[in-house]
Amino acid sequence: LVSGCADLTALAAR
């Protein structure tokens, strides 16, 4: 889950 969360955050940060 953490991995998915980080991935989403990176996408949102973009």
From Swiss-Prot:
Alphabetic keyword roster: Calcium, Heme, Hydrogen peroxide, Iron, Metal-binding, Oxidoreductase, Peroxidase
E.C. no: 1.11.1.7
GO molecular function terms listed in the Swiss-Prot or TrEMBL record: lactoperoxidase activity; metal ion binding
Catalytic activity line of the entry: 2 a phenolic donor + H2O2 = 2 a phenolic radical donor + 2 H2O
A GO biological process held by the record: hydrogen peroxide catabolic process
Needed co-factor(s): Ca(2+); heme b
Source organism, top-level taxon: Eukaryota
Bound cofactor: record note: Binds 2 calcium ions per subunit. Binds 1 heme b (iron(II)-protoporphyrin IX) group per subunit.
Family: Belongs to the peroxidase family. Classical plant (class III) peroxidase subfamily.
Functional summary from the UniProt entry: Removal of H(2)O(2), oxidation of toxic reductants, biosynthesis and degradation of lignin, suberization, auxin catabolism, response to environmental stresses such as wounding, pathogen attack and oxidative stress. These functions might be dependent on each isozyme/isoform in each plant tissue.
Name assigned to this protein: Peroxidase 6
Organism this protein belongs to: Daucus carota
